[in-house]
Amino acid sequence: MYCPFCRNPDSRVVDSRMADDGSAIRRRRQCPECGRRFTTVETTSLSVIKRSGVGEPFSRSKVINGVRKACQGRPVSEDDLAMLAQEVEEQIRASGAAEIDAHEVGLVILGPLQKLDEVAYLRFASVYQAFESLEDFEAAIAQLRHEAQEDAAERPATPRKPEKTSL
């Protein structure tokens, strides 16, 4: 690592810490030549391979922009979108792959988006999965209803509190 002050090609790591929820390493370095300290942030590269075969760095902002269109007019905040993009990136990085197809990124988006807003999920899925008919929408809605029923069945019933009666 070159020193940004004197351009010496060597430096010594003084301190290392995790940053950005573990997706990066922040290192404090010291130059043996001039003695000045500087900070570096190291992240692993994650490339998205587009349909054309061209690779580009993964971008949370592209995820947010794509999902924002599906969330238009819905009660979804910018913070919600940022959290969704972070969750998508974490899931992709957890796979351990340095490269991922753009199609796979879309599949990863569907899960967190479904939890965030079902209408936005349907909008995104309709474009992403190229819905061509009402039957496609009906099948997706039926799947959402089925999953909601399964979730409700898995949750334990909460005991009702006895009502107070006045004497």
Swiss-Prot record:
InterPro entries in the record: ATP-cone_dom, NrdR-like_N, RNR_NrdR-like
GO molecular function: ATP binding; DNA binding; zinc ion binding
UniProt keyword annotation of Transmembrane helix present: no
unnamed zinc-finger residues: 3-34
Domain ATP-cone: 46-136
Superkingdom field: Bacteria
Gene Ontology biological-process annotations: negative regulation of DNA-templated transcription
Keywords linked to the UniProt accession: ATP-binding, DNA-binding, Metal-binding, Nucleotide-binding, Repressor, Transcription, Transcription regulation, Zinc, Zinc-finger
Region (Disordered): 148-167
Keyword S-adenosyl-L-methionine set for record: no
Pfam families: ATP-cone, Zn_ribbon_NrdR
Record note on cofactor: Binds 1 zinc ion.
Cofactor: Zn(2+)
Similarity comment text for this entry: Belongs to the NrdR family.
Biological role stated in the UniProt entry: Negatively regulates transcription of bacterial ribonucleotide reductase nrd genes and operons by binding to NrdR-boxes.
Protein name (database record): Transcriptional repressor NrdR
Species, as recorded: Pseudarthrobacter chlorophenolicus (strain ATCC 700700 / DSM 12829 / CIP 107037 / JCM 12360 / KCTC 9906 / NCIMB 13794 / A6) (Arthrobacter chlorophenolicus)
GN (gene name): nrdR
